[in-house]
Amino acid sequence: MAFKIKVNTEEGYILIRHYGETDLNENIQIGEKALQVAIKNRIKNVLVDVTGLTGGVSITDLFASTSHLAESTAEKPKTAIYGRQDQQRELEFIETVGLNRSMPIKSFMDRNAALAWLLMGNKRNSD
């Protein structure tokens, strides 16, 4: 699987784009890399785009990767994840697992809605 991480310091968020197929180990690696980038850049908002994913990830792997990332650090960036309509069930599951582990996360089917929620109350936007 391919992915890109882009830091938007102007608006104060990190964008992660997933492409192709994925598995448990790759999900964990990407999440850990994103956390490192967020901490290094002192950014507390993460926007995750999974519209480019193909295939599927098992519910067990979604549970394991989300749990691992939520519990791996005290730093829990606010995370908005958005995808296609056919991914809604999985994204809602990720949201539930994350919220149950005190991770501020919300799933969306629309990028603009995800970004609006993510940046709501962001000091950089109100300066």
Q: What do the predicted segments below correspond to?
A:
Residues 1-127:
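Amphipathic, Lys/Arg-enriched alpha-helical "gate/interface" segment within cytosolic domains
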